[in-house]
């Protein structure tokens, strides 16, 4: 038997497009009340309108998660439907550059968005979940968090850190009935991946594949928690 998501409140970061939008749409279709957040109001409004057109409930809140004040304000605004049941930390950013040539300011932004923001959001939202003895924190990581690559040191390090955070948080709150998981997709076909003649995008992981994994965690039996899920393409997308 799976858990009902009807009327559960889900906060999805980076929900304006790509994986975040797909997660928000799938959860709304499953009955969740979805709070969308990103930096672009236009993108958020488009996703919210798509959800509402299908009969779902959604609220959009513009926020820059690299700033603590924005994060705290987001958490306050997210109480519209009551305490948040599910936190989906999807927002992420990275700029490719060698360690020698990288701008340290880019490192700071990468770590603040990819690691610090998920930790701060969890810190602020978990007390209500602990009180209810129910809830979930799902972090969208990357296979780059399992194996580093050249010119991606900060991004990989932030995703390695996200895995460590997930594992630690799981141990802290597992007895409170709260599911904690990290999903590690490979190359996903989103607007962030530029056109490349060597890539067959139809064979790439799709955003909804990741959304399906999120839904799987949230509806898994209360006796188990899929703490880490790696998603790889079934067939190689390289021509």
Model-inferred region functions:
Residues 16-17:
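Conserved glycine-rich cofactor-binding loop
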Residues 42, 62-73, 104:
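The beta1-alpha1 cofactor-binding region of Rossmann-like NAD(H)/NADP(H)-dependent oxidoreductases
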Residues 98-99, 106-111:
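Substrate-binding pocket helix/loop in short-chain dehydrogenase/reductase
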Residues 122, 158:
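Active-site helix of classical SDR
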Residues 142:
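Residue(s) in the substrate-gating loop at a strand-loop-helix junction
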């Amino acid at each position: 038997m799976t858990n009902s998501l009807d009327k559960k409140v889900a906060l999805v970061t980076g929900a304006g497009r790509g994986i975040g939008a797909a997660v928000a749409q799938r959860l709304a279709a499953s009955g969740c009340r979805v709070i969308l957040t990103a930096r672009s109001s236009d993108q958020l409004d488009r996703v919210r309108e798509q959800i509402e057109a299908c009969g779902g409930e959604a609220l959009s809140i513009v926020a820059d998660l690299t700033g603590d004040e924005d994060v705290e304000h987001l958490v306050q605004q997210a109480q519209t439907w009551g305490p948040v049941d599910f936190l989906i930390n999807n927002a992420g950013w990275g700029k490719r550059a060698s360690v020698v040539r990288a701008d340290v300011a880019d490192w700071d932004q990468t770590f603040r968005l990819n690691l610090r923001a998920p930790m701060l959001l969890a810190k602020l939202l978990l007390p209500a979940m602990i009180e209810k003895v129910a809830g979930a924190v799902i972090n969208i990581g990357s296979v780059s968090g399992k194996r580093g690559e050249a010119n991606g040191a900060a991004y990989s390090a932030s995703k390695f850190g996200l895995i460590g955070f997930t594992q630690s948080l799981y141990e802290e709150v597992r007895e409170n009935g709260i599911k904690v998981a990290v999903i590690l997709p490979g190359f996903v076909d989103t607007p962030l991946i530029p056109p490349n003649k060597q890539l067959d995008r139809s064979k790439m992981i799709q955003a909804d594949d990741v959304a399906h994994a999120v839904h799987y965690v949230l509806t898994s039996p209360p006796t188990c928690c899929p703490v880490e899920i790696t998603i790889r393409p079934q067939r190689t997308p390289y021509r």
